């Protein structure tokens, strides 16, 4: 019994030693090297880091960034604490000099109908403000967003702008860079729709200079002066400009003083020079006009008897040219003068109308010739004066018969008229011409016009051999088409030569 009790006590003692002994030993044992510890490691009591290590650790963690940020905030708060952004720098002492530079992101499109163009720019303005000077290791301070509104900014506005858009995504696209010597660089991005007076007299071979003028709105030349920064206009050539019908040819500038009721203001102006690409106008207007004019000459090769065909060709060409002339002015400003394109279309219209007029004259002359030959008169000299009384009665009867015959053009009327009948009807005999002469009051306008035309036009084959045509120009009516086949193309060719030489050299 006793041995069992001793054995149980021994086991209890050993178990107690196993639980307590190892825990005490682990506390005094240093941590293993391969164990990961998060956070600062515990240091043995009584051991301190050197002062140098403490300074470096603080400098690389919190003290150095907080120190710079604090100094920048102190500088900004100091210079803006007593700063009044409503007053310009050097007020009452000297004018503020503002240096200007422009960077062009894109130019165009140019609208000839609205007389305006669009331009996207980054506008730089530089001036000195003694109130913003500071003495520190910081060379510059950059302000953006709403903080810029706490500074004095030149009240520059664009004089010929219709609409101006500033960008505010993701923040307002403006920035102010303050140097330690008080120099301020203000940058803003904007898109401007500006007026551009286009003089379309040489259209479509025209060139234009679109201005962009700016000045101060409230400060005259005694308070604010604008200067070019060596006239630097940077252009982003890699960007695709939306000029469409124009080519950019260059830029120049001008500085002027404009007098207003409130003072004299300095105005700075950029001029963007562009020239038109007239390839589109050539295919849209010039080629159709030329082709229509040449197609109207087809009527010269159509027979005179085909009046309907020749009339349809002439009328169609005239109406087509009228349509082209109207269409060329569709997307065009309502100017009161003729452009180079209008002049070209007008000449083509005149040539087409002359083609139709040539057919009209030819048809009129040949028709009157046939009508006059259809009713010939045979004149008989009087043999006895006693026949006058008898012939007068017959003359009245024949006059009524002739009136009825003229109403029926198909009837061939052959009249025998004596000298007495001519005297009764008012005709006078001319021994030189051997034919009756018609007094002015008894002949209609058509007869007078016909007589005038007979002085220059030969309406009967072989008429140039007659005595009454001697010494006058003889033009054969039936040869008018032959003359026109040569005259019209030559005229149109020389017109094109003169037109393009003058227009391309303007």
Swiss-Prot record:
Catalytic activity of the protein = chloride(in) = chloride(out)
Q: Where is the composition biased (Basic and acidic residues)?
A: 50-65
Q: What does this protein do?
A: Epsilon subunit of the heteropentameric ligand-gated chloride channel gated by gamma-aminobutyric acid (GABA), a major inhibitory neurotransmitter in the brain. GABA-gated chloride channels, also named GABA(A) receptors (GABAAR), consist of five subunits arranged around a central pore and contain GABA active binding site(s) located at the alpha and beta subunit interfaces. When activated by GABA, GABAARs selectively allow the flow of chloride anions across the cell membrane down their electrochemical gradient.
Q: Which cysteines are joined by disulfide bonds?
A: 196-210
Q: What remark about domains does the record contain? A: GABAARs subunits share a common topological structure: a peptide sequence made up of a long extracellular N-terminal, four transmembrane domains, intracellular or cytoplasmic domain located between the third and the fourth transmembrane domains.
Q: Which GO terms describe its biological process?
A: chloride transmembrane transport; chloride transport; gamma-aminobutyric acid signaling pathway; inhibitory synapse assembly; negative regulation of chloride transport; response to xenobiotic stimulus; synaptic transmission, GABAergic
Q: What is this protein called?
A: Gamma-aminobutyric acid receptor subunit epsilon
Instruction: Tell me which family the UniProt entry assigns to this protein.
Output: Belongs to the ligand-gated ion channel (TC 1.A.9) family. Gamma-aminobutyric acid receptor (TC 1.A.9.5) subfamily. GABRE sub-subfamily.
Q: Where in the cell is it found?
A: Cell membrane; Postsynaptic cell membrane
Subcellular location, principal: membrane
Transmembrane regions listed in the UniProt entry = 278-298, 309-328, 345-365, 486-506
| Alphabetized UniProt keyword annotations | Cell membrane, Chloride, Chloride channel, Disulfide bond, Glycoprotein, Ion channel, Ion transport, Membrane, Postsynaptic cell membrane, Signal, Synapse, Transmembrane, Transmembrane helix, Transport
Matches recorded under InterPro entries: GABAA/Glycine_rcpt, GABAAe_rcpt, Neur_chan_lig-bd, Neur_chan_lig-bd_sf, Neur_channel, Neuro-gated_channel_TM_sf, Neuro_actylchol_rec, Neurotrans-gated_channel_TM
Q: Which Pfam families match?
A: Neur_chan_LBD (PF02931), Neur_chan_memb (PF02932)
């Amino acid at each position: 019994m006793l041995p069992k009790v001793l054995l149980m006590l021994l086991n209890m003692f050993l178990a107690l030693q196993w639980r307590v002994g190892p825990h005490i030993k682990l506390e005094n044992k240093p941590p293993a090297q391969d164990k990961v510890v998060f956070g600062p490691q515990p240091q043995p009591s009584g051991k301190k880091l050197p002062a140098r290590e403490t300074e470096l650790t603080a400098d690389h963690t919190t003290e150095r960034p907080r120190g710079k940020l604090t100094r920048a905030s102190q500088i900004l708060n100091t210079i803006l604490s007593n700063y009044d952004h409503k007053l310009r720098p050097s007020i009452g002492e000297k004018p503020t000099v503002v240096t200007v530079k422009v960077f062009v992101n894109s130019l165009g499109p140019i609208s000839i109908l609205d007389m305006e163009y669009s331009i996207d720019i980054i506008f730089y303005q530089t001036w000195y403000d003694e109130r913003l000077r500071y003495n520190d290791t910081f060379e510059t301070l950059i302000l953006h967003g709403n903080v810029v509104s706490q500074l004095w900014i030149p009240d520059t506005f664009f004089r010929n702008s219709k609409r101006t858009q500033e960008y505010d995504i993701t923040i307002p696209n403006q920035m102010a860079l303050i140097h330690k010597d008080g120099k301020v660089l203000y940058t803003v991005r904007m898109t401007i729709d500006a007026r551009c007076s286009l003089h379309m007299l040489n259209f479509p071979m025209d060139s234009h200079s679109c201005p962009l003028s700016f000045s101060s709105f409230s400060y005259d030349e005694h308070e604010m002066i604008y200067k070019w920064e060596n006239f630097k206009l940077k252009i982003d050539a890699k960007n695709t400009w939306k000029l469409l019908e124009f080519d950019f040819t260059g830029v120049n500038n001008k500085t002027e003083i404009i007098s207003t009721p409130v003072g004299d203001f300095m105005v700075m102006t950029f001029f963007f020079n562009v020239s038109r690409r007239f390839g589109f106008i050539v295919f849209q207007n010039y080629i159709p006009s030329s082709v229509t004019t040449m197609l109207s000459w087809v009527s010269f090769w159509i027979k005179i008897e085909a009046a309907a065909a020749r009339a349809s060709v002439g009328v169609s060409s005239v109406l087509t040219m009228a349509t082209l002339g109207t269409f060329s002015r569709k997307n065009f400003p309502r100017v009161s003068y003729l452009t180079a394109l209008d002049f070209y279309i007008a000449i083509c219209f005149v040539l087409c109308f002359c083609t139709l007029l040539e057919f009209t004259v030819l048809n009129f002359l040949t028709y009157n010739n046939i009508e006059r030959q259809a009713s010939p008169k045979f004149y008989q000299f009087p043999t006895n004066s006693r026949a006058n009384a008898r012939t007068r009665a017959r003359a009245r009867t024949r006059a009524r018969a002739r009136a009825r015959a003229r109403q029926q053009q198909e009837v061939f009327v052959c009249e025998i008229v004596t000298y007495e009948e001519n005297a009764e009807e008012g005709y006078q005999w001319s021994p030189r011409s051997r034919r009756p002469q018609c007094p002015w009051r008894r002949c209609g306008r058509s007869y007078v016009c016909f007589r005038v035309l007979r002085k220059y036009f030969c309406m009967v084959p072989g008429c140039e051999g007659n005595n009454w045509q001697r010494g006058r120009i003889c033009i054969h009516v039936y040869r008018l088409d032959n003359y026109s086949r040569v005259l019209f193309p030559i005229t149109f060719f020389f017109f094109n030569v003169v037109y393009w030489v003058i227009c391309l050299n303007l």
